[in-house]
Amino acid sequence: MSNSKLPIKYGLPERLVVGLLNKLTKGHLKVTYTDGSSRHFGNPDEPVSAAVIINNDDEFFRRCAYYGNVGMGEAYTDGIWDTPDIRAVISWFILNMQALQGTDTSSDKLPGVGLLKIFNWFRHLRRANTVDNSRQNISEHYDLGNEFYSLWLDATMTYSCAKFQDPNLEFEKAQTAKYEALCHKLKLKSTDHVLEIGCGWGGFGTYASKTYGCKVTGVTISEEQAKFARERVKREGIEDKFEILIQDYRHIKGQFDKIVSIEMIEAVGDRFHQSFFAKCHEVLAPNGIFALQMITVPDNRYKSLTKGVDWIQKVIFPGSLLLSVGRVNEVLLKTSDLFLHDLEDFGAFYVHTLENWHERFNAAKDSLLKLEFDERFMRTWNYYL
């Protein structure tokens, strides 16, 4: 049955969602109802590129209409809808992102959708990254257990974008290539004392101290990460080179020749950007270098992101916020005499990084289930990865 002949059965929520999807013209999404009937969105002349199979029609449209992208994500993890290929569904929405978002609005401002998003927004506001909240926010994600992450991260235990100069490069080598690139940008010497803000499981600090002979002080607020990193340092025999501290960045003291921070600043939040960069300026030695790897958004979308909350912010990284390059420059001007000297964009490598994580995560499914992570958890992380 075609879209035009299929009646609206579930009232205003269905009408709003169908009305929005009808505006999307790229690709071909097939949505199948519980009775077997279906609607087609995008370009019907193209082969079906993504499929949504609804298991509870009424609840699906209610979640999507009331809570926007957050509702759709939570509906997936709750089994309200399914798909043979979650990446294809998300790719279809990305393909139509311009129609969904325009040039300066967030995905939570879809016309007529997300009617109750204010409840998620208030919840997000309560998770602002104060010293106490930061520990809670980080713990919820990174303290799922070192065994959990070791089952699907590569051997370096790196949880950030790798650098694939060659798309066929082995994952571990691509992560090591990223570390080497950062060391090169930092112009590391054996006499340097390096501060790593957000040291994770110790991958970069281990590489830098062993390869360049420099001293590294790594700070984290994750108890699990600190435990793993300290054991790693001892195992590698670099106790005299690499020190791990459980410490909030706001409490860092001393002076360092170089600073590095790898995809940690996303956990700082708009309210605390100035304090973050002011602290970096305070502890960086004269003529020092600060290498910052971060996930960015276009400048024209940053402001809108500060006023909304998406599924990842609610479910995966509470309190998080992506920055734009313009936002970084704005804060640097207000807080320090630091300036942007070199900018490299390797965001395209995140495609390969996520592909590796997704495949490795699902390959470890049986082991993860034995750790008492249930099917809902698996669906949540599949949606994320």
Walk through the language-model features, giving the residues of each:
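Feature captures hydrophobic
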Residues: 1-175, 181
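A short glycine-rich, Lys/Arg-flanked "PGG" loop and its adjoining helix->strand segment in the class I
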Residues: 274-286
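Substrate-binding/catalytic lobe of Class I Rossmann-like enzymes that use SAM or dcSAM, i.e.
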Residues: 296-385
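A short acidic, Gly/Pro-enriched loop at the edge of an enzyme's catalytic core
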Residues: 250-259
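Conserved beta-strand signature within the Rossmann-like core of class I S-adenosyl-L-methionine
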Residues: 287-295
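Conserved class I S-adenosyl-L-methionine
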Residues: 190-200
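Conserved SAM-binding loop
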Residues: 229-230
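Conserved SAM-binding loop of SAM-dependent methyltransferases across substrates and taxa
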Residues: 201-213
